[in-house]
Curated annotation (Swiss-Prot):
Glycine amide found at: G7
Subcellular location: Secreted
Stretches that traverse the bilayer: none
Phylogenetic placement of the source organism: Eukaryota, Metazoa, Chordata, Craniata, Vertebrata
Organism of origin: Litoria peronii
Known function: Induces contraction of intestinal smooth muscle in isolated guinea pig ileum.
The name this protein goes by in its record: Peroniin-1.1
GO BP: defense response; positive regulation of smooth muscle contraction
Assigned keywords, A-Z: Amidation, Amphibian defense peptide, Pyrrolidone carboxylic acid, Secreted
Family classification: Belongs to the frog skin active peptide (FSAP) family. Peroniin subfamily.
Location of Pyrrolidone carboxylic acid modifications: Q1
Cellular component, GO annotation: extracellular region
Amino acid sequence: QPWLPFG
């Protein structure tokens, strides 16, 4: 997920 650092 682009808005999460692990996404």
